[in-house]
C-alpha cells in the first residue's frame, strides 16, 4: 500500500512539473531567442538583443545595457527600483508588467534652489526659486519606447524627475514623453517637468502625479497677444503690472508677445496631451485624477487644435477629477473631445480655466472652482464644425475673473458660449461667477450659440469706469450676442441672481454708469432674452438701456432693481416681441422716464401684466402703441400704487 501511494504521488508531481514553465538563467545576450522564461543575473551588453515573442524576463541581480531589444508581448519582472534597462530601446511591446521610472536609468534628483538664475531682467531675483537636477531627456526617450505599444502595464514615477530644455525644442517647450498605441496603462506618482503626449492610446489612467514648471509659481508680466513686442507699456508712468494691482514691479518693457519667451518665465509645456492628429488615431477611456499642474502652458489637453477637423481622430470617454491647477499661461483644461466628465477640479491664475472647444459634445463640468482668471469658461466651436458641439453643461462650479493675469489688449468675459449645434442648449446651472474689472472689456457673458440657459446661478459683477481715456465704459454690455450662424441666439435666465455694482471713484464718488447695456446684440442678426424668477440688482447705473434692440424679451416673476438708466431713460429699447408678467422694476430713470421704447415696425407684439414700476416711470411707452398689438393689465407705480395704462 505504501509503495502504491509513493507511486501515485510521484506521478502527480510529474504531471504538475510538465505544465510548469521552465526558468532559464541567461548566459549571454544571444541566448533568449526562443520563447521562454529567462532569469538575468548579470549585465548583458549588446547592440541588438532578440528575445522570443511571448517570453518573460526576470531580473535577479543583472541588467541590460545599450541594446535595442526586439520582442513582442514581453513580460518584465523587476524586484525593485534599480536600473535594469540602461540606455536601452524596445522594438516591439511589453505586457502584464509593473515598472518604475528608475528601472530605465531616470535620476530622481530634481531639487529647488533658493536663489534664481532667471535671466529675464524683470525678475525679482530674491523672491523666486527655480528647479534643477539631472537631465533625464535621453532616459525618458528610452522608457517611452517600452510604454509605446504596451498592454496591461503599471508604471510608477518613483521620484521627482528634472528635464532640461533641449536645443531642438521650441523656446517655450521642454521635450514630451511620447507614448503611442498603448492599452490599459496605469501611470502614477512622482513629479515631472516633461509633458506626456499620448497618441492613439486607450484605457489610460494617470493619477497622483505633479507636473511643474522650471520655476515655482509667480505672477507673469503683462502680456500682449496682438500688440507689437517693441511697444513699451506704462500706465501713468508706472509699470503696467503694478498699476493693475500686480505683485511685482516689472521693468517697463517686461512683457511678452504670444508664447515668445515663456521659457524665461519658467513655464513648461502642456502637462498631458491626448493627441489624435490623424483620422486613423483615437484616444479613449481616459482617467486623469488626483494630479497637480503648475507653471505650464496648458494642463490637460484632450485632442489638438487643427485647421481641418475632418482630418483628426476622436478623443472619447475622458474623466478629469480631483485635480488642481496653478499659474497656467493658457488653459488648465482644454478639449476637442466627446463624452467628457470634469469634476472637482480647482485652480488659480490662468488665462481661462476650461475650454470646451471644437468637436466637443456630451461634456459635463461639475464642481469646478477657479480664481484669479482673465476669462471665464467657454464653449466655442469653429463655425464650420458647430454642428458637432452640443449637449455640454457646467454645474455646481465657481469662477472668479479679476484679471490678475494681465492681457493688455484683450477683452474679458465671465462666460462665453460661442457657436454650437442649431437647436442645442448650452446649460450653466447652480454656479457662481465673480467678475471684477477696472479695464475695458466688451461683455461679461457673450453668446454666439443657438441657446444658452443659465439657471440657479449667481453673478457678482463689480465694475469701474475706465480711467485712462481708452473707453467711456468699463464694458459695453453684460450679456452680448455677437455675429453668429445661429438664426436667433437666445439667453434663458432662470432663478438667477445678478448683482451689478459700480466701484467707488477717488474724485467723483460712486461711478453711476460704468456700462452701456445689460443685454444687447453686437453683430447678431437677432437676439432673444428670457428671464424667469430672476433678481437683477445693484448700485451700478446703465447709460443707455437694460435690453437693447432685442428680437424678443420675456420677463416673468422677477425683480429688476439696479441703479437705473441715464441717457435714454428707459429699461427696454425697441423689442419686437415683449412679454412682462409679475415683475417689479426699481431704479431711477433719466431722460424719457419710460419703461419701453417702441420699435417702428408693424409686426411687434407687447404684453405687460401684473407689473410694478419705479416712481420715476411716467409712462410705459415712448410712443402710443397700436392697441391691436399691445396688452396691458394691472401695471402700477410702486410709490403711488396708481395704474399706468400707456
Regions inferred by a protein language model and the residue ranges of each:
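C-terminal/domain-terminus segments
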Residues: 304-314, 319
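Short glycine/acidic-rich loop motifs that flank beta-strands on beta-rich extracellular proteins
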Residues: 66-70, 163-173, 191-200, 214-223, ...
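All-beta strand scaffolds that present successive hydrophobic residues in beta-strands
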Residues: 51, 57-59, 75-79, 155-157, ...
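Extracellular beta-strand-rich solenoid/capping regions of secreted or surface-exposed proteins
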Residues: 44-56, 64-79, 117, 135-154, ...
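Extracellular "leader-to-stem" segments immediately downstream of a signal peptide or signal-anchor
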Residues: 1-173, 188, 247-250, 254-263, ...
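Extracellular beta-strand solenoid repeats
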Residues: 39, 45, 50, 58, ...
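Flexible coil/linker segments and helix-coil junctions enriched in charged and small residues
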Residues: 69, 74, 113-131, 223-225, ...
